[in-house]
Structures are given as C-alpha cells and as structure tokens.
C-alpha cells in the first residue's frame, strides 16, 4: 500500500498537479498581485499630473489582471519631475531626444516638454512598462511601448487601456500565473 501511495504521489507531482502553469495572456484567468510596488511621487507634480500618473498605474493594474499593484509610499519606485531635458544628462547620453527616462527604481519626466494630457498619460504608461521590465515593442502599432512617444496611436492617448500586446509582453517578462 505504501508503495502504491508513493507511486501515485510521484506521478501526480510529475504532471504538475497543484502547480500553477504560466499563461501568455493575463486576461485568460484572474491574477493576483504578489508584491505591491511602493512608490513616491515628487511633490513638484501638480494635481493634474498626479492624476495622470495614477491613471497610468491603473492601466497596468487592470491590464495585467491585477498582477501589478502600486501602493503609495515607499521607494520601490520614485517618480521625479524635471524642468529641463539637460537634467537627464547624468543618466542618459541621448538626453536631447527624450522627455522621460526610467533607470532602476527611478522615472524622470521632463514635464514642460509634454503638452497633451493623453500624451502625458501615455508617456507615464510607457515608462511604467520599462520599470516593469518591458523593452520597446515595434512589431505592432497598438502598443504604449514604441521607442518614440509620437508613435503611440492616438486611440491610446484618448482611451487609457493596456493593449493585448503590452499585456503579453508583461507576462513574458514576469511569467504570469493564474490565481488559485
């Protein structure tokens, strides 16, 4: 009897029973946030800019099926406001071409260079994607992760929702699983 029980246990464990398989599409099943990202936002952002940052975080939270969650307070992510592009120079050799930069636990945004509210939100969604480990995506038009913010479709500037391609990129990087 003990031998039979051991054999069944070995068989079940080899089949992965009880293990959660990874999924490519976060919409395929409910997820859960394993670890909230504690963040702080520079006090120099005005209330409208802070609202765009909050909306961008919601895009990732909802678009990943809850696998990403942000919690105010903390230093996992620090979002800073810059007044001029040349302030990016210490971290970015191509600073003249950028309106934002993500490195490590920091996102720097050159606020005066972004006029349109939809563009601002799209820019923050893009930079949060980098913080989550996603690189530039050029194999589809419908993504926030283009190498140039002007390549982001206007529809994404207007309607803040995570495109399927960006959600799949998140799952490729973070190995999404289904909540039990």
Q: Language-model segments: which ranges?
A:
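Short basic coil micro-motifs at the edges of alpha-helical modules that engage polyanionic partners
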Residues: 42, 111-114, 159-161
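Structural signal for conserved beta-strand scaffold positions within catalytic alpha/beta enzyme cores
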Residues: 41, 81, 146-147
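Post-HExxH zinc-binding segment in Zn-dependent metallohydrolases
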Residues: 146-178
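Mobile beta-alpha loop/short-helix "lid" or hinge segments that flank ligand
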Residues: 139-145
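Metzincin-family zinc-dependent endopeptidase catalytic domain
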Residues: 47-139, 150-152
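A generic secondary-structure signal marking the coil-to-beta-strand transition
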Residues: 35-37, 105, 141
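Disordered inhibitory propeptide/activation segment of secreted metzincin zinc metalloprotease zymogens
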Residues: 2-50, 55-58, 162, 171-180
């Amino acid at each position: 009897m003990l031998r039979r029980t051991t054999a069944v246990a070995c068989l079940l464990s080899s089949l992965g029973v009880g293990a959660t398989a990874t999924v490519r599409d976060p919409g395929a099943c409910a997820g859960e946030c394993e670890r909230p990202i504690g963040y702080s936002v520079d006090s120099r952002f005005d209330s409208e800019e802070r609202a765009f940052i909050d909306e961008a975080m919601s895009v990732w939270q909802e678009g990943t099926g809850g696998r990403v969650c942000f919690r105010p307070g903390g230093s996992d992510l620090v979002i800073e406001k810059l007044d001029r592009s040349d302030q990016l120079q210490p971290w970015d050799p191509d600073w003249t071409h950028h309106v934002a930069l993500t490195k490590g636990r920091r996102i720097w945004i050159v606020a005066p260079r972004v006029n349109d509210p939809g563009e601002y939100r799209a820019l923050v969604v893009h930079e949060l994607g980098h913080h989550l480990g996603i690189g530039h995506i050029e194999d589809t038009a419908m993504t926030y992760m283009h190498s140039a913010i002007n390549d982001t479709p206007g529809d994404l500037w207007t309607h803040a929702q995570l495109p399927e391609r960006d959600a799949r990129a998140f799952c490729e990087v973070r190995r999404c699983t289904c909540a039990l």
